[in-house]
Amino acid sequence: MNTDTSSPETAPSGVLLVHGAWHTGTAWDGVAAGLRARGIPVAVAELHRGSLAGDIAAAEAALDELAGSGPAIACGHSYGGAVITGLPAGRIAHLVYLAAMMPDIGETSMGLLAGAPPSDLRACIVGDFTGITTIDPERAGPLFHAQLDADSRAEHVTKLVPQVMAPGYEATTTAAWHARPSSYVLCTDDRAVHPDLQRRFGTRATHTITWNSDHGAFASHEADTVELLARLAAPAG
């Protein structure tokens, strides 16, 4: 755990948003709009590159879209946490893990899930766990968005896409949270990533924040997510 809690003397270059498995960058539409309305530059990574290394490279390329030259706030949701963990620490001002994987060097996302108390995730996955999978559309809403109304839940489910499982079995080779401050957002109503596993990750973070949220906190707690990221993106002073 990095214990540096100081804020940057100048504003970070912006906020990088990294989606989770079975999702795309559209998951962040509301959060991105909220940040941009406050004048905060935003870059949204698009993953699904077939490997953890490829997804990390895609996220780093998204960092290049930010106009500022300084380090950025990187926020990863779910599997996206493994991606931001692998980013070069020198390009990151603060890491935010939103109900996310927070692996250490040598750990894999699938290994961490297998070693945790069972959630509803495995029963909702359709397909070959070593190949390409989807989420059962009848179960996806309650799994990811239990706190949304039926219409909003259905809208988010239509955005889900197939997921290559290989990145989940790839070991983390570098962990930026050892070198940069981090915040872990623990979602206590999460049915996909068990809250007990999230508590374990919270012990690795500089700060732990607890929300009574489902897995898709970017939607059910959109305003809270915007507020957290905007605060971190503001310069000290």
What are these regions (language model features)?
Residues T10-L52, G70:
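Conserved HGGG/HGGXW glycine-rich cap/lid loop of the alpha/beta-hydrolase fold
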Residues H48, G54-P71:
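Conserved acidic catalytic loop of the alpha/beta-hydrolase fold
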Residues C75-G80, I84:
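Gly/Ala-rich beta-loop-alpha elbow adjacent to hydrolase catalytic centers
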Residues R91-P137, V164-G168, V193-H194, R200:
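Flexible "cap/lid" loop of the alpha/beta hydrolase fold
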Residues E155-A176:
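Active-site nucleophile elbow and catalytic-triad environment of alpha/beta-hydrolase enzymes
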Residues A179-L186:
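Catalytic His-Asp charge-relay segment
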Residues C187-N212, G216-A219, R231-L232:
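Conserved loop-alpha-helix segment in the C-terminal half of the alpha/beta-hydrolase fold
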